[in-house]
Amino acid sequence: MNCPDCGDEQTRVIDTETSADGTSVRRRRECQRCSFRFTTYERPEWDSLQVKKRNGTIEPFNRTKLRAGIERAVEKRDVSETTVTTLVDDIESALQDRETRLVSSSLIGELVSDRLRDLDKVAYIRFVSVYKAFSEPQEFLRELDAVLNAEIDDFEAPNDSQ
C-alpha cells in the first residue's frame, strides 16, 4: 500500500478492526519513510455474473436487459412496475445465490418463464414464444395448450379442506 502523502511503498499496519456486521476491515497504517498515518478499508468485491449465450459468447449479466424482456412480455397487461421490479430482483437474487458466476442464458430464460407462468399466462406465452424461438404455429399452439390444460387441471382439482 503506497503512502498517500509521500508515495512510498513501505507502510505498516498499526491497528486492524473488523466492522460490527463483519463486511469490512478497517486498518490504520503508518508510512515507514515520513510517519504519515492513514486509514484503509477492505470490503469483498463480488465477482460479477457472466452470461453464456446460445452462440457461446460470454457477456456480463445485464439487469436492464432482463427487465426489458420482462416488460415486453407484460406490456399492456395488469402488472405493476413494483411487481416487475420484484420479479427482476428475485431472478437476480436466484442467480447470485448460485455457486458459479457463469450462468447460461437458457437458465435465465427458464427462471423468467417459470415466474411469468405463475404471474400472468398471457405474458408467459409472449415470453416463451420469443425465448423458445417458435418457428411454426404448431409450437405456439402446443405451448398454449399446455398452459390451458394446466389451468383446467388447477380449476378441477378437488378441494381437500372440506
UniProtKB/Swiss-Prot annotation:
The keyword Ribonucleoprotein does not apply. Residues 49-139 form the ATP-cone domain. Binds 1 zinc ion. Residues 1-21 are annotated as: Disordered. One of its GO terms (molecular function) is ATP binding. This is Transcriptional repressor NrdR. A zinc finger (unnamed) spans 3-34. Negatively regulates transcription of bacterial ribonucleotide reductase nrd genes and operons by binding to NrdR-boxes. Belongs to the NrdR family. Its cofactor is Zn(2+). Keywords: ATP-binding, DNA-binding, Metal-binding, Nucleotide-binding, Repressor, Transcription, Transcription regulation, Zinc, Zinc-finger. The keyword Nucleotide-binding applies. GO terms for biological process: negative regulation of DNA-templated transcription. PANTHER family: TRANSCRIPTIONAL REPRESSOR NRDR (PTHR30455:SF2). It comes from the Archaea. InterPro entries: ATP-cone_dom, NrdR-like_N, RNR_NrdR-like. It holds the Pfam family ATP-cone.
